[in-house]
UniProtKB/Swiss-Prot annotation:
Residue numbers spanned by region NMP: 31-60
Subunit and interaction comment: Monomer.
Protein name: Adenylate kinase
Source taxonomy: Bacteria, Bacillati, Actinomycetota, Actinomycetes, Micrococcales
Gene name as annotated: adk
Record's catalysed reaction(s): AMP + ATP = 2 ADP
Length: 193
């Protein structure tokens, strides 16, 4: 069983790579962003609350996010492993995830960090906004999201690095090239254990 996280700044390719890697490893990819967007589209109470934060480029509060992740990780399809994208983003969420996993006698195996230059990420996200019409992808909001990543989520990365779980991977390049780099990085972390 493989339990993994994929982290990285907005636009670094986490969602795309999560799908490719989960297919290769035969595990389920879980995206908190997809779950939030589905709730927003369905106008659920969670979705309406989340939308306010998402439109401003802010993180959805831990109280909402933690409950959603806990519920998702208790579903049947994660029993063979998972690749979680978009969570945890804060130290408090790391603690919550540790609690969720340890309650089931589990722990993380690998944390993948996709890296990319901020200016490249802004270009990618502005292009995505034009293609998809996402309201949370204008340049001001994009730069705010990048700043949030650097100030909050990078502390999460440091924590996992200290635990020997982190594999840093350059997220720039063709999808299959990045996927190959990720698979090699996963093998490297597993071999070091």
């Amino acid at each position: 069983m493989t339990r993994m996280l994929i982290v990285g700044p907005p636009g670094s390719g986490k969602g795309t790579q999560a799908e490719w890697i989960s297919d290769r490893l035969g595990i389920v990819a879980i995206s908190t962003g997809d779950i939030f967007r589905a709730n927003v589209k369905g106008e659920t109470p969670l979705g309406l609350e989340a939308k306010k934060y998402m439109d401003a480029g802010d993180y959805v509060p831990d109280s909402v996010t933690n409950k959603m992740v806990r519920d998702r990780l208790q579903q049947e399809d994660v029993q063979h492993g998972f690749l979680l994208d978009g969570y945890p983003r804060t130290s408090a969420q790391v603690n919550e995830l540790d609690d969720i996993l340890s309650a089931g006698g589990e722990k993380l195996d690998v944390v993948l960090q996709l890296t990319a230059d901020d200016e490249e990420l802004v270009r990618r996200l502005l292009g995505r906004a034009k293609e998809s019409g996402r309201s949370d992808d204008d340049e001001k909001v994009i730069r705010h999201r990048l700043n949030l990543y650097h100030t909050q989520t990078e502390a999460v990365v440091v924590r996992y690095q200290k635990l020997g779980l982190l594999a840093k991977v350059d997220g720039i390049g063709a999808i299959d090239e990045v996927t190959d780099r990720i698979m090699a990085a996963i093998d490297g972390v597993r071999a070091a254990k």
